[in-house]
Each structure stands twice: as structure tokens, then as C-alpha cells.
Amino acid sequence: MIRKSKKITKMRGSRTCGYGEAKKHRGAGHRGGRGNAGHQKHKWLSVCKFNPDYFGKYGFNRNPGLIKQLETINIGELEEYILKYKDAFQVEDGKVVVDATEIGYEKVLGKGRISTAMVVKAVEFSEGAKEKIEAAGGEFVEL
């Protein structure tokens, strides 16, 4: 709704223009500081009541050296890779032999579809990848 007169025009003569006492509109003194100021001083009780876990440390950060991160490839992507570079792979008993570690991958995951019978060698396989490789007439070899 459009107002004909601005707020300041309405407030003329009221001295505080809607801010209560004259001192209340100056800086942040009326609020006890801006934002989180005073949370360990004069606002401590409200912190204890409404946000008791705000201060202090919780949990731990795991040592990055202990985390095992494997380079992964999905079985569908692996088949695309084989079809793209056919000449680079050996064929034994009608199955393409693929060593995933030679192309920079350690774990084979099960996303995607495959129709090529292949012998896949890798450090690890997901359950889905194992099922799909065997369903296509291939086999997997864990290194």
C-alpha cells in the first residue's frame, strides 16, 4: 500500500521518532554490544541457556595419513575406456584382460552397464562390480 506521507514526516515533533528513550538509538550501547559481543561477559547466562555447546572443542580431526583414499572407476566407464583403446588391451579366451592399476585406478565400482566379457584386475572391487563382471561372462582378480 502506498503511503502519502513518509514516516519521518509523521514523526515530526515526537523527539525520538519511534525509538523510545533518546539514548536508545545511539550506537549499540542499548543492546549491550553488536552481534555476539559480551557472550563470555555480561551475556553469559543467555549463552548457557540457549547455546550451551557454543564454546569448547568437540570431536577430533582424523590424521590424514590414516585415511585410505583409493582412485576409483565405475565399471561402465571402464568398458568405455576399453572400447576407445581396443588395441592397448590383450584378449585371452575371448575376454579382454584389463589391469586397472596400470591405467591409474585401484578400485572398481559397480555403476553402469557392461556387455563385454573381461578379466579385470584391481586392488578392490565393490559387490555390484563383481556381480556385473560375472553376469557379462567375465571374471575379477583382486591383486
Swiss-Prot record:
Q: Which UniProt keywords apply?
A: Ribonucleoprotein, Ribosomal protein, RNA-binding, rRNA-binding
Any GO MF annotation of the entry? rRNA binding
Please name the InterPro entries in this protein's record.
Rbsml_uL15_N, Ribosomal_uL15, Ribosomal_uL15/eL18, Ribosomal_uL15/eL18_sf, Ribosomal_uL15_CS
Renumbered residue ranges of the record's region Disordered: 1-38
According to the lineage, what is the superkingdom?
A: Archaea
From the record, give the cysteines joined by S-S bonds.
none
Q: Does the keyword Hydrolase apply?
A: no
Q: Which Pfam family is one of this chain's hits?
A: Ribosomal_L27A
GO biological process terms, alphabetically, are: translation
Q: What does this protein do?
A: Binds to the 23S rRNA.
Name of the protein in its database record: Large ribosomal subunit protein uL15
Q: What is the lineage of its organism?
A: Archaea, Methanobacteriati, Methanobacteriota, Methanomada group, Methanococci
